[in-house]
């Protein structure tokens, strides 16, 4: 992974004068404005959404926190989230797609939504198997066998193309095998969106929004519409990468 220069993610110091107030939304003149010291603190210690909500309940902080977070993430508009997956055993590709950050969506509150690039070569996450022997058995504890699944290795990176067309990665969001259960695949109804979480049964920080487009036995073609990443996780990864 190549090193990149940190993108500016803070409010210019010339805009912050001692004992002054910053109006983040001129149209909301009735809203109480935050002291610049609080704004500096939030800018320095993101993610701070929960902290400022509990500590300064008298201010319209949800609005201001969201504005600050969106400002910190705005530079990502130049980047793509690239997702590559392959079957662990057959080594065959399952998906290869890229997505760009879209507008904030109330439907996925707390997540940054990356919509597939219009020029993306494929939007399909394809899993297939011939019979049960193609599915891996998994025993978490002695005598406890979990539902049949397919082992898939997912690699997600946040990167952009430089002028010489080389990829400049900010960081790898995820690079681990996941177990895709057959019963979960069978439960997906065509045309109904579902979320395929990469960190199943944990915190749900990265996932694909998918719909099933093929109901043939042993074949699952999932159409990917977007990738969602927990905003707090994304900010945390960025802070670790640039410091």
Curated annotation (Swiss-Prot):
Function as written in the Swiss-Prot or TrEMBL entry: Probable substrate recognition component of a SCF (SKP1-CUL1-F-box protein) E3 ubiquitin-protein ligase complex that mediates the ubiquitination and subsequent proteasomal degradation of target proteins.
GO molecular function: ubiquitin-like ligase-substrate adaptor activity
Keywords, ordered alphabetically: Ubl conjugation pathway
Domain F-box: 28-73
Pathway membership, UniProt: Protein modification; protein ubiquitination
Organism, scientific name: Schizosaccharomyces pombe (strain 972 / ATCC 24843)
Keyword set includes Electron transport: no
GO CC field: ubiquitin ligase complex
GO biological process: protein ubiquitination
Name of the gene this protein is made from: pof15
Top-level lineage group: Eukaryota
Protein name per UniProt: F-box protein pof15
